[in-house]
């Protein structure tokens, strides 16, 4: 068994999906804030870590795995949840990447925008989200199961769930127009 430490900031953004996957797979891990793990200010730490960004997953106090989707794929593999069929794995990766692309419009608005700035960003983002959610709903319907690639969740499911869930901070009713995605989040 590997020692796992997920390092991030105190915000809801890129560490939720890995934590959901690790909890689901009953993996032991520590979740640490950057300043606690590195014992230094972010500006001092940033140049020393891969790609100068978080989250990172520390494996066995030796290896640093950067980039959210790489972390998700590693954890999925470690938990034995990776699809064995290469075509299914590629389709799952496409869904994972598509979900991750939702981070850019959602995160700055949900976590940092307030007042009129929030309302303005929300209104300009909803048409794009509607199109992206329609794509995800179609993929979920084409999967024909409870989850995107079958009857058990894998990395893409946790990532999609996280982004759909935080989108409800924009408009609690927005997701209702996508009945299958709403069911996915509810279940």
Give each language-model segment a name.
Residues 1-133, 142, 148:
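GST-like domain detector, emphasizing the conserved glutathione-binding G-site
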């Amino acid at each position: 068994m590997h020692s796992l430490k997920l390092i991030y900031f105190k915000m809801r953004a890129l560490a939720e999906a890995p934590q959901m996957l690790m909890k689901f797979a009953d993996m032991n891990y520590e979740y640490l804030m950057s300043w606690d793990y590195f014992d230094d200010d972010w500006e001092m730490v940033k140049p020393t870590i891969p790609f100068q960004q978080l989250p990172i997953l520390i494996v066995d106090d030796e290896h640093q795995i950067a980039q959210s989707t790489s972390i998700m794929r590693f954890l999925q593999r470690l938990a034995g949840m990776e699809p064995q069929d290469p075509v299914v794995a590629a389709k799952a990766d496409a869904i994972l990447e598509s979900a991750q692309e939702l981070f850019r419009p959602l995160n700055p608005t949900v976590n940092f925008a307030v007042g009129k700035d929030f309302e303005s960003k929300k209104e300009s983002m909803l048409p794009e989200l509607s199109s992206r959610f329609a794509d995800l709903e179609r993929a979920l319907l084409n999967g024909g199961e409870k989850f995107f690639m079958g009857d058990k969740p894998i990395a893409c499911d946790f990532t999609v769930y996280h982004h759909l869930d935080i989108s409800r901070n924009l408009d609690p009713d927005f997701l209702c127009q996508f009945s299958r995605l709403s069911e996915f989040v509810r279940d």
